[in-house]
C-alpha cells in the first residue's frame, strides 16, 4: 500500500482523502519505514500538498489526539510559523489579551522550530507551566479564561514522525496540519499562514472536514503569518460551509502603516519582555497596535464586535489601561 502511494506521488499525482488518511494510520501503526516516510513527505512537498491530502492528514491526527474537555467553547490564535520573519510572538500576546477581555482561549502551541522563540518558549519565560493533563487544561479554560496546550503532549502520532521531519529539515504537510489540530472544544479560530497559496489550501481542507468559523490570513506584502500593519493582509474566512476571500490594509481602520522591522523580536526572554511591556501598556505603539488589530479580528470572528475598527479601539484602550497586565498578575497568583 505504502509503495503504491509512493509511486503515485513520484508521478506527480495527488492522493485522495482516504489515501492520505491511510498514510497517517500507517505511521501510527509503525508500518512505514523512515525512508518511505521521508520520501512521501518530500514528494508531497515537491508536487504541492493539495486540500484533500491536508484534510486526510488532519482527520486522523485529530482523531488520535488526546482531547481537552473544556465545557465553554474557546478560540485559538496561532500560526503555521515558517515565515522566517523573526517577529515577536504576536499571537501569544493576542491570546492573553483576549483572555483578559473575558474571551475563553485554548492556546495551542509548540517550541521553536525555525524561529528563535516558539509560543511555548515565551509562555514559559512569562512564568507559566504547561500541563499534560487534559482535564486540568479544560479547567484552566473554564475557570481562568485560558488554557495552554503544548502540542507534543496531545498528538502521539505526530511524535512518531518527529525524527524524520527533523532530518529532512524542511517544511512538510505536518506544518500545515499542526495549527489545525487543536484538541479543545472550539468556537472559532484565527490562523496565520506563511504563504497565500498554502492559506487557500488549508481553508479548502477545513471545508472538506466540515470545520467552521476559522479565519485564515497571510501578510501579503511582508510575508508574515500575522495580520499585518506594514502592508496588505489577505484572508480566507470559512463560515457556514463557505469560504469568503477579502483583503485588509491598516488604512482601512485609520491606523498608520509601520515598517516590517518595527515588529522584530528576539529569543524567548526578549520576546517575553516585549509582551510584558505590551500588557502594561508601556510598549512601542507599533507593538500595541499590531496586538490590538489581531485581537480585533478575533473579536469580530466571535461576533463580539460588528466592525474591526470598533474592536481595535476597544482593545487598544484596554491594553493602554494596563488591564491585560492586571489579568496576567492574577494568573500568576500575585493579586486577589
UniProtKB/Swiss-Prot annotation:
Enzyme class, first EC level, given as a word: transferase
Binding positions (Mg(2+) 2): 225-226
Disulphide bridges: none
GO biological process, any: L-tryptophan biosynthetic process
Binding site for Mg(2+) 1: 91, 226
Amino-acid positions noted as binding anthranilate 1 in the UniProt annotation, renumbered to this chain: 79, 110
Cofactor: Mg(2+)
Binding site residues for 5-phospho-alpha-D-ribose 1-diphosphate: 79, 82-83, 87, 89-92, 107-115, 119
Cofactor: how and how many bound: Binds 2 magnesium ions per monomer.
UniProt-listed Enzyme Commission number(s): 2.4.2.18
SUPFAM superfamilies: Nucleoside phosphorylase/phosphoribosyltransferase catalytic domain, Nucleoside phosphorylase/phosphoribosyltransferase N-terminal domain
Pfam families reported in the protein's UniProt record: Glycos_trans_3N, Glycos_transf_3
Domain of life: Bacteria
Keyword Cell inner membrane in annotation: no
Binding residues annotated for anthranilate 2, in chain numbering: 165
Keyword field: Amino-acid biosynthesis, Aromatic amino acid biosynthesis, Glycosyltransferase, Magnesium, Metal-binding, Transferase, Tryptophan biosynthesis
Known pathway: Amino-acid biosynthesis; L-tryptophan biosynthesis; L-tryptophan from chorismate: step 2/5
Reactions the enzyme catalyzes: N-(5-phospho-beta-D-ribosyl)anthranilate + diphosphate = 5-phospho-alpha-D-ribose 1-diphosphate + anthranilate
GO molecular function: anthranilate phosphoribosyltransferase activity; magnesium ion binding
A Gene Ontology cellular-component term: cytosol
Similarity remark: Belongs to the anthranilate phosphoribosyltransferase family.
Task performed by this protein: Catalyzes the transfer of the phosphoribosyl group of 5-phosphorylribose-1-pyrophosphate (PRPP) to anthranilate to yield N-(5'-phosphoribosyl)-anthranilate (PRA).
Entry protein name: Anthranilate phosphoribosyltransferase
Organism the protein comes from: Dictyoglomus turgidum (strain DSM 6724 / Z-1310)
Amino acid at each position: 500500500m505504502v509503495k503504491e502511494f509512493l509511486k503515485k506521488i513520484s508521478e506527480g499525482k495527488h492522493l485522495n482523502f482516504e489515501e492520505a488518511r491511510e498514510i497517517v494510520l500507517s505511521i501510527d501503526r509503525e508500518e512505514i519505514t523512515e525512508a518511505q516516510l521521508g520520501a512521501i513527505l518530500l514528494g508531497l512537498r515537491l508536487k504541492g500538498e493539495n486540500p484533500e491530502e491536508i484534510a486526510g492528514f488532519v482527520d486522523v491526527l485529530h482523531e488520535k489526539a488526546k482531547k481537552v474537555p473544556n465545557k465553554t467553547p474557546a478560540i485559538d490564535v496561532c500560526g503555521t510559523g515558517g515565515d522566517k520573519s523573526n517577529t515577536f510572538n504576536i499571537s501569544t500576546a493576542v491570546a492573553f489579551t483576549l483572555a483578559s477581555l473575558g474571551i475563553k482561549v485554548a492556546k495551542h502551541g509548540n517550541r521553536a522550530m525555525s524561529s528563535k522563540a516558539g509560543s511555548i518558549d515565551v509562555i514559559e519565560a512569562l512564568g507559566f507551566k504547561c500541563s499534560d493533563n487534559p482535564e486540568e487544561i479544560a479547567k484552566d479554560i473554564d475557570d481562568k479564561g485560558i488554557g495552554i496546550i503544548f502540542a507534543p503532549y496531545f498528538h502521539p502520532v505526530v511524535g512518531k514522525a518527529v525524527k524524520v521531519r527533523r532530518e529532512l529539515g524542511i517544511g512538510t504537510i505536518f506544518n500545515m496540519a499542526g495549527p489545525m489540530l487543536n484538541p479543545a472544544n472550539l468556537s472559532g479560530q484565527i490562523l496565520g499562514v506563511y504563504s497565500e497559496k498554502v492559506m487557500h489550501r488549508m481553508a479548502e481542507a477545513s471545508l472538506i472536514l466540515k470545520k467552521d468559523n476559522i479565519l485564515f490570513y497571510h501578510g501579503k506584502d511582508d510575508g508574515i503569518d500575522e495580520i499585518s500593519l506594514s502592508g496588505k493582509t489577505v484572508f480566507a474566512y470559512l463560515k457556514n460551509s463557505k469560504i469568503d476571500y477579502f483583503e485588509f490594509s491598516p488604512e482601512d481602520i485609520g491606523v498608520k502603516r509601520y515598517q516590517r522591522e518595527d515588529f522584530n523580536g528576539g529569543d524567548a526572554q526578549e520576546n517575553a519582555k516585549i509582551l510584558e511591556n505590551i500588557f502594561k501598556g508601556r510598549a512601542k505603539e507599533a507593538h500595541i497596535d499590531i496586538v490590538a488589530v489581531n485581537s480585533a479580528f478575533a473579536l469580530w470572528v466571535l461576533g463580539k464586535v460588528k466592525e474591526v475598527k470598533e474592536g481595535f479601539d476597544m482593545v487598544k484602550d484596554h491594553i493602554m489601561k494596563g488591564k491585560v497586565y492586571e489579568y496576567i498578575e492574577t494568573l500568576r497568583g500575585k493579586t486577589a
